[in-house]
Swiss-Prot record:
Major location (coarse): cytoplasm
Protein name: Protein GrpE
Family label: Belongs to the GrpE family.
Compartments, record wording: Cytoplasm
Gene Ontology CC annotation, any one: cytosol
Species assigned in the record: Actinobacillus pleuropneumoniae serotype 7 (strain AP76)
Function according to Swiss-Prot or TrEMBL: Participates actively in the response to hyperosmotic and heat shock by preventing the aggregation of stress-denatured proteins, in association with DnaK and GrpE. It is the nucleotide exchange factor for DnaK and may function as a thermosensor. Unfolded proteins bind initially to DnaJ; upon interaction with the DnaJ-bound protein, DnaK hydrolyzes its bound ATP, resulting in the formation of a stable complex. GrpE releases ADP from DnaK; ATP binding to DnaK triggers the release of the substrate protein, thus completing the reaction cycle.
SUPFAM superfamilies named in the record: Coiled-coil domain of nucleotide exchange factor GrpE, Head domain of nucleotide exchange factor GrpE
GO molecular function, one term: adenyl-nucleotide exchange factor activity
HAMAP family assigned: GrpE (MF_01151)
InterPro entries, per database record: GrpE, GrpE_coiled_coil, GrpE_head
Gene3D superfamilies assigned: 3.90.20.20, Head domain of nucleotide exchange factor GrpE (2.30.22.10)
Gene giving rise to this polypeptide: grpE
Record keywords, A-Z: Chaperone, Cytoplasm, Stress response
Assembly: Homodimer.
Length: 198
């Protein structure tokens, strides 16, 4: 019986070893399955985070590009404002000087008919020189006269007081200038008051 017992005991040990091996193998498979599931979940989370980071980078680049564009727009507008300020800083002052020009021209027209001697002529010549110098100085700063007889009527720089037929002047052209107009750097300071040939 001893040999049978030993044999049975050996078989029992073999079965037990086989059962343990099978249990270990089952445990390893069970352990591998959760690890694979966790690994798949981790990869999915990594992909999700990479997508989020890429989207955040794109948003940041977009915000940065918009900010740079806005800065360029602000600079351009500031440069334009400065340029306009330089061009038109004299506008109010120039408008006030137009009255002086008008008065000088009226005085010259009145003196032309009143000249009787050399002293008076010297006075007229002096006023004419002053007038020319004054007009020249205004021109240096971009102030120019508009409204000349025979010039085509332009409603942007001329103000028509009336229409009348005029010999030798085409229709819609200036026949009489009642008051000269002036521009500053191309911008109207005062429109010319004119009569237009009809």
């Amino acid at each position: 019986m001893t040999a049978q017992n030993e044999n049975a005991q050996a078989q029992a040990e073999q079965v037990e070893v086989a059962n343990e091996a099978q249990l270990e193998q089952t445990a390893e498979v069970q352990q591998e399955q959760p690890v694979e599931a966790e690994l798949a979940a981790a990869y999915a989370r990594i992909n999700e985070l990479e997508t989020y980071v890429a989207e955040a980078d794109n948003r940041e680049k977009d915000i940065q590009l918009r900010a740079q564009a806005e800065i360029q727009n602000i600079r351009r507008r500031a440069e334009q404002d400065i340029e306009k300020a330089h061009k038109f800083a004299l506008e109010k002052f120039s408008k006030e000087l137009l009255t002086v020009v008008d008065n000088l021209e009226r005085g010259l027209n009145a003196l032309d008919t009143a000249v009787t001697d050399e002293k008076t002529q010297a006075l007229v010549d002096g006023v004419e020189m002053t007038h020319k110098e004054f007009i020249s100085t205004l021109a240096k700063f971009g102030v120019e006269a508009v409204g000349v007889v025979g010039e085509a009527f332009n409603p942007e720089v001329h103000e028509a007081i009336s229409m009348q037929p005029a010999e030798g002047i085409e229709a819609n052209h200036i026949s009489v200038v009642l008051q000269k107009g002036y521009t500053l750097q191309g911008r109207v300071l005062r429109p010319a008051m004119v009569m237009v040939a009809g």
